[in-house]
Amino acid sequence: YKRQVVTLDEDDNIRQFIPGSKFSYKKKTEYFKTVNIYKFSREFSRTHYVPFLTAYSKALGNNEYYEQVLRVIALLDKPEIKALRLGGEAWYEIDDIQDLDIAASIFTPDREEHLRLMESRYGGYWRYPRIRDFCYLVNPYFPNKRLMSELKANFERLVREYPSGMRVNSLLAAKYFGISQEYICIGNGAAELIKALMSRLEGKMGVIYPTFEEYPNRVKPDMVVPFHTASRNFTYTADDLMEFFSGKDIGTLLLVNPGNPSGFFLPKGDVLRLCLWTKTRGIRLIVDESFVDFSCGMPDNTLLKDGILEEYPHLAVVKSISKSYGVPGLRLGILASADRELAAWIKKDVSIWNINSIAEFYMQIFGKYEQSYVRACNRFMKERDRFMQELSRVPFLNVFPSQANYFMCEVKPPMKARSLTGLLLKNHSILVKDCSRKKGFEGREFIRIAVRDATDNDALVRAMHAETGSEPSSTCPTNGESPFSSCSTSAS
């Protein structure tokens, strides 16, 4: 679309060459991107292309794209220029260093290098329209179309206006979650708040492995006291944690609940027991509940209540809005604590304009869509149950039950997690998370698979079976289409 697109008739004759200045995003489904490969017959060159090229260069000079000549020829009654539609072949147009970087990640022949280049991007996969991203974790059923339409309707003004500062946005976040404004901090994603919080902590930190490593990576390795459950299913109880950490000198205990990547959910009653236990021992408790809205009984599982925060002022609750609310591109997260000194310090530590106007507007209007969000989460849970049944039929996978929007899967011999991840990407354009190198999985092979909508989930199941020659129990539509169809052109 950057240089030239065309429109076709039912016989694949090119009707128009559309230059960039005439490109309309409203008509993008009608366009085909040219791959800049042309075959001209001698007769076409003699009767059409060379005469028009000569006249065009005399009139407008030589500093023009050759396709401008084809654009003029296409206006004739019988231009005799046909297109050949590509059938899924990989191609990429390279005009600058960004294009070169993307093309390198697409066309490298080495499977491991292909995977490494894709993983190292940490997102931005809209640049790869055929990729199905099962690596990063969002809600496939929210936001709904009406909310997205409201964002789009206000997009131009929001882009041109400054966002509010921390005070106003903390008020919005407080309204969003129904807690006091002085207890809550809003961040440019939870990652910004995690960084600020970890720099504030004193003493060693107890960490339950495997975990979301953004937390322990923010402290020195010798300041981490690791807990490894004896359960091969990576489950544990509040009693297990209290017994283990009772004899340890820690200033902070981290609980990611549901666990990432395990998906294990410690019941709220056990979490409240941990709140009391840490309070009596002067231990800061951090609970990351970014995925709690995907847990069964979700409205009652959160700790984001004024009463809970006030009873346990040593408690800090972190929540990523990106995950369960399906808006990772907006970069929103919150931290809540009745420790007013901590909350005030974090608000000063981050930038006053740490979220943009579009993210602020989303927070402003969310209340109108709260019931739609609850329905989306309930719909998600049903699809998660169905998806688990399908994944469980894959011969080389052991799927762990999950209360989050992903499954942790053990990869059984002779398959390896790394090779499976590479095969899915190279052969099926599916990206999953290779967890084989994560701490806590030593000696075992694991991947993490996001739960997406039914069409994508079934595509992944089919791809898994294709790598073993086994048969899936159900079928679904084939690979998704690129935003622009592709074609090469020829003239007779």
Residue ranges and their predicted role:
Residues 198-218:
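Conserved PLP-anchoring active-site segment centered on the Schiff-base-forming lysine
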Residues 2-60:
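Conserved core of the sugar-phosphate nucleotidyltransferase
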Residues 32, 165, 314-400:
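PLP-dependent aminotransferase class I/II
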Residues 232-298:
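Active-site phosphate-binding strand-loop segment of PLP-dependent enzymes
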Residues 162-163, 174-196:
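Short loop-beta-helix segment that forms the pyridoxal 5′-phosphate
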Residues 143, 426-427, 438-492:
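PLP-dependent enzyme catalytic core of the Aspartate aminotransferase-like
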Residues 380-381, 394-428, 451:
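Conserved PLP-binding catalytic core of the aspartate aminotransferase-like
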Residues 106-161, 248-249:
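N-terminal "arm"/small-domain region of PLP-dependent enzymes with the aminotransferase-like
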